[in-house]
Amino acid sequence: NSSYVTISHNRKYLYSITDFGVESYRILEDGSLSVINHASINGMRGCYLSTDYEDKFLFVAGYHDAKLTVLRVRENGEIGEITDEIYHKGLGSIAERNFKPHINCVKMTRDNRFLCAADLGMDHVVVYELNHMNGRLRQVDIIRSEQESAPRHLKFSKDGKLLYVVHELKNYIDVYTYSVDKEHRMPIFEKIQSISTLNDYHAGGSAASALNISEDFKYLC
């Protein structure tokens, strides 16, 4: 059974999480799909996947095992070998999540340099530098959120200069500026705003789950 799906940036291929790992499809002219291949992620079922902006690598977030998997993508859309596997470790702050790390979203910066991984169990976003030659990741930063806020989903602005992070349990969005230190080639994230996703008259029982931006890039949903 498929769950989360994503489309390559060249709009030619669709990738899906399945029971056995990930699967790739060719998008035909009539909109139908043709299976290309499938690949194991060597772990528990993923919850989110995305590609880099050159469509050379596929990233899979693991909620259940806190595993981040990187797989190579070939020019014909076929999923290749695993190039890196990283397990988030540590003691989380949320009792109902068993005090464990849970990776829920992975997304590249728009300049295609860094991969951001939202861990709602650890209340932070881990930032990795991607080696475009071998598909390996190197941790370079951590964006820390409020305790028990559960950062769940990420979105970058059209120009790539702003990062939006929605927090599931406390129902608010943090806004960060993004830039790169040219001397040290390191990412810089600075928080400029926190805004609630709830109205003043909200009665409770809400949990923020995802972010999207309107086609005109004027509204965050």
Residue locations for each model-derived region?
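Short loop/turn segments immediately following the C-termini of beta-strands
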Residues: D19, Y63, V73, L120-G121, ...
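Short loop/turn segments immediately following beta-strands, especially the blade-tip
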Residues: Y25-S32, L71-G80, E129-R136, Y176-I188
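A short beta-strand motif characteristic of beta-propeller blades
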Residues: N1, S34-S40, G90-E96, R138-R144, ...
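Residue-level detector of Asp-centered blade-edge/turn motifs that repeat once per structural unit
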Residues: I7-R11, Y53-D55, R110-D111, K158-G160, ...
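Blade-loop segments of beta-propeller domains
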Residues: N1-D55
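Asp-box/WD-like beta-propeller blade repeats and closely related beta-sheet repeat scaffolds
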Residues: V35-C105
